[in-house]
Amino acid sequence: VSRGLGDVYKRQIAVSGGNTPALMFDLWANEYMEITPWDRMRIYWVDERCVPPDDSDSNYGMMRNLLLGLTPILYENVFRIRGEAKPAKEAVRYSELVRQQVPLKRGWPEFDIVLLGAGDDGHTSSIFPGQEDLLTSNSIYVVSAHPRNGQKRIAMTGYPIQNARYVIFLITGKNKVDVVEEICHSGDTGPAAYIAHHAQNVELFVDKAAAAYIDDSNKKMN
């Protein structure tokens, strides 16, 4: 993240929710608080569950509690998705906000950093398997729905994610081994793999459990 910030005065960073980003936010607050240039960061969200900010499911609420509430960042530089609003209207509002504030490149917003997680089903940015058409939407944000519980979400689509200067995947847990394999090798088989194979600059950070496939591949090669 520090490398992605560089020397430019304001950097545009889009963050995700989920268990793995929560681990990063906690580490960030406890280990890197003092060296982070908070005055040079603008924070946006990749996706949000359609719930109020104080709901335990809120991605914004999680980051506020684990990190933002502990930092000196000005809230004028924090741009949350309004999960309590009507989903379709909020997707349009937030798309327009991002289009106006984030520099454009090739007609799409160019975030400096997009931080992504991945589910054990291969979803990312609240775009789930079977919803791959949302990846190629001409909108910046769209409404999606969880395939099991039907919970509405607002999700960044494929083109603005792929257009970011850095796309960083954070993946942990042995239940994500197959997802790591998809990302490393199989191309367009799921949303996370699709992004990994189409983004201009991708970095993958995994823990030992999620990296089991990579370890096995290296052993076979050796």
Which stretches of residues belong to each language-model region?
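Glycine-rich beta-strand-to-loop/alpha-helix junction loops that act as flexible
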Residues: 15-20, 116-120, 172
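ATP/nucleoside-binding phosphotransfer catalytic cores, i.e., glycine-rich phosphate-binding loops
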Residues: 159, 165-222
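A glycine- and small-aliphatic-rich helix-loop capping segment at beta-alpha/alpha-beta transitions
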Residues: 26-37, 61, 65, 129-138
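A short secondary-structure junction signal
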Residues: 91-92, 125-130, 179-183, 216
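Single conserved hydrophobic/aromatic residue that forms the stacking wall/gate
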Residues: 1-9
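Short, conserved loop/helix-junction motifs that constitute active-site signature segments
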Residues: 34-42, 72-73, 133-135, 159-164, ...
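Class I SAM-dependent methyltransferase SAM-binding "motif I" and its flanking Rossmann-like core
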Residues: 116-159
